[in-house]
Amino acid sequence: MFWTFSFQGVTSLNFFARDYVNAPFNYTLFQSANPLYILLFAPLLALLWPWLSRRGRDPSTPRKFGIGILLVALSYGLVAAGIHFGTAADGKVGWWVLAGCYLLQTIGELALSPIGFGLVGLLAAKEETSFAMGGWFFGSALAYQLAGRIATLTTGSGTSAYSGIADYEHVYLWMFAAGTVVSLGYLLGAPQVRKLMHGVH
């Protein structure tokens, strides 16, 4: 789910930026937000996790997965709220809405992505490691496919700017709700999942 939602950054969010975001710069610059945020926040999280670990408060891997999904869900909640409450007379929202969306997604990615692939190698049986890693990449490919299908739902169905932007609001609100429910499942079920992880934190 995380990657399906995150991959909207190169699909529907890109078109949303082009058509419905009022920014003092070219909309293509939003594609630089994720790598810029990674450069800024990856060192901070690299310091945060060991700091929490020394105090016995480092979230377990299942909880980090839940945090990542929750943050990507909140990113679409932010966009939906920006559309609902912040659409100007020209039918566009402020650029800060999309900047905040990418920020939440990037922090979620940093919480989930670095440990996800490594976890496959740690938990898979030695003779099945290659197969398990292939499954990880297959999941990414499937996420791209689903992301494309979700992106098609955001295409404008009306003749005015407001009717078109409403499609984005509805889809992103649904993504916010679905992502929040799944993330809560991860967070609440983390203790049970950890028991199946053979001592891996």
Feature locations, PLM:
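Membrane-embedded alpha-helical bundles of multi-pass transporters/translocases
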Residues: 2-5, 12-16, 29-191
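Extracytosolic (periplasmic/ER-lumenal) interhelical loops and adjacent juxtamembrane/interface segments
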Residues: 17, 21-22
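Short, positively charged loop/turn segments that connect secondary-structure elements
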Residues: 25-27
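Intrinsic disorder in cytosolic terminal tails and internal cytosolic loops
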Residues: 193-201
